[in-house]
Amino acid sequence: MARGNQRDLARQKNLKKQKDMAKNQKKSGDPKKRMESDAEILRQKQAAADARREAEKLEKLKAEKTRR
């Protein structure tokens, strides 16, 4: 039986473990600061989504006007 892919599998497993460790380290620190930064990120995402929806609404209205 060939076992040539053990090294590759070990690398993949280690990369996954390192990603999880990095994610956990990101969650460390002052919870209040993290909560504020997360809230700011969500506000930015929401503002972008609102702007996109508004642009889509304007495009839809323009398309309806040109049909008439």
UniProtKB/Swiss-Prot annotation:
It comes from the Eukaryota. Its main location: cytoplasm. The keyword Iron does not apply. InterPro entries: SERF-like_N. The modification Phosphoserine is found at S37. Residues 1-43, 50-68 have a biased composition (Basic and acidic residues). Keywords: Cytoplasm, Nucleus, Phosphoprotein. Residues 1-68 are annotated as: Disordered. It is found in: Cytoplasm; Nucleus. Belongs to the SERF family. Present with 876 molecules/cell in log phase SD medium. This is SERF-like protein YDL085C-A.
